[in-house]
Amino acid sequence: MKISVQNPGITDVLGMDEGFAAIKKAGFDAVDFDLSSFYRWDDIINGRKCDFFFDGKTLWNYVEEAKKAAEKYGIEFGQVHAPFPCYIPKCPEGTANVQETVKLSIDACGYLGCDKIVVHPAFDGSARYPSLTHEEEYKLNIDFYSSLIPSLKKNHVVCCLENMWKQDWGTKKIYTACCSDMNEAARYIDELNAIAGEKLFGFCLDTGHLLLLSLDVYDCIVALGNRIVALHIHDNNGVDDEHVLPYTGVLNWSRFIKGLREISYKGTINFETCGVHRKFPKELLPSMLSLLADTGKYFDEKINAPEEQ
């Protein structure tokens, strides 16, 4: 399997060329290319458009720079991450703007030769003052994801839904959210593919989000089975969404390996560990990345070993 890492905390720290060089030297085959960090939260929730996506040139200059660096160092684009949140309560302009950037991101994904994009479900992240019923949320997402089908078909891209969480911002308590129930997640994928008439939707399983909700990673993997086509691999302390390296938090990684073995997962081993990338001085980034790539190779060996070891 190909080993991949997200680029935030690497290319923005080292520069695009040096960042891709470091990714290659560490032993990675692919990158999880992030487009989610260029739309400021304050702009999103107030319905303001951002130049990066809407001036007609900045996004494409950035994508072209990344494409050239990736080609230079032999790095593939394993998946792209679209902007979020995809629903802003009481701000239809903000919701429309973000959903438009998702379509632009699908176009960018196709241009990069990448066949997968991760798009968060549309949901209200506030557990204290929820603005949607479960039925309203489900319909909202079916309509939203269905609207992406023409762009997905045009660019030959699979849209990956992701398991989410929400929080009571007053008490800091974390609650289940859209696609954190694996039966619901499977229902989304199956219904959307039926609407599309082909397999245009899959699932990106986020290990850290499972851990925040005390969900067993093995059970979730087996429940989704071959609907899982991408991964966000990271660890945490079980309380905060830290996005740290595997084995530095409390997730049971043997259960993770067992689950992927059981479903015969053959996709990319992708790390979403930006929470730790920026904690290291840039001089130590190469060493940290090498450890992470070695962890990916270890997972690959264990998942694909002839017998469990």
Annotate each predicted stretch with a short phrase.
Residues 32, 79, 118, 160, ...:
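Conserved beta-strand positions in the central sheet of alpha/beta enzyme cores
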Residues 71-72, 86-202, 209-212:
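Active-site acidic/histidine proton-transfer and metal-coordination neighborhood
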Residues 35-45, 85-87, 124-127, 166-168, ...:
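Conserved radical SAM core fold
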Residues 32-66:
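Glycine-rich, proline-tolerant flexible connector loops at the mouths of alpha/beta enzymes
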Residues 1-6, 78-88, 124-129:
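N-terminal small/glycine-rich loop or linker at the start of catalytic domains
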Residues 56-64, 139-145, 182, 289-293:
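Well-ordered, non-membrane alpha-helical segments in soluble/globular domains
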Residues 52, 56-72, 147-152, 220, ...:
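Catalytic-core regions built around general acid/base machinery
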Residues 1-4, 9-27, 37, 99, ...:
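Histidine-acidic metal/acid-base catalytic patches
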